[in-house]
């Protein structure tokens, strides 16, 4: 896709995970709840649709010997929309665990001429028509902030049930007053859309569920401690952002085990101590919707508890609009 705000750099990590027997043995012994979600990530995972099908079939065999129900999802750019729809319709993927990234109706980030805006938009609309509970994620950036309202209406008019507006890591314009003003107008329009359409607006969920928490607790990463990332070599990480090969920010490995050897609890304890440090930003902030990636903070600033603090004003605007909409003080 070659998005001009992509943090991955020019390097491409080739290869896919294939140690299905080691994975099954690991999952068999792993303590779990009644349900365990498995998500395929990339790159673009739908390039390997046949491999995904094989892995899902094998993993589901564990339901015969282990009291657990597996659900499967992935994150995609949506271009392989026929493969995605097939995986959902055939019962391989759980529709609500699928996320599709989109830059909106007037995206200008497709460098390959065969992927023009019309092709990308039609791919997204095809997915929504067949699978309306898939979450469509729209990045907030300069070249689409004025058209996000139109893009959301295009999705909702086609039956979309779940939309998220997501922030780009280290995007400098989030601190510029003129861009903040643009975003404020955009968020106000989104709130008006929400009053007319029934859909899941992911941005407001953290405000809803975290309203009674302290800001420092609410803004912690929801992945760390509840997720395990398995890379193509079978190594275990707290999440995909801590894998050095895939994240240009991380310079030290935070590997916490391997499928064969299991989880390194000494390393997880070290990680826990890092994450429990007091957040290094304003003590007076009330933005329970705040979030910064600990892995990026570690790689760029040198510590997981430090903060860029460049989304603060936008998060506060979102929070105030949410409170006004819901009549919160």
Name each region found by the language model:
Residues 12, 23-41, 48-168:
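Radical SAM/AdoMet-radical enzyme domain recognition
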Residues 1-20:
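Canonical Radical SAM [4Fe-4S] cluster-binding loop centered on the CxxxCxxC motif
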Residues 6-9, 87, 242, 296:
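Residue-level signal for well-ordered alpha-helical positions
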Residues 90, 218-221, 227-230, 272-274, ...:
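A general structural signal for short secondary-structure junctions and capping/turn motifs
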Residues 1-4, 34-39, 46, 230, ...:
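N-terminal pre-triad scaffold of radical SAM enzymes
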Residues 15, 110-233, 241-254:
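Radical SAM enzyme [4Fe-4S]-AdoMet core and its adjacent flexible, acidic
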Residues 243-329:
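Flexible mid-to-C-terminal extensions adjoining Fe-S/redox cofactors in radical SAM and related proteins
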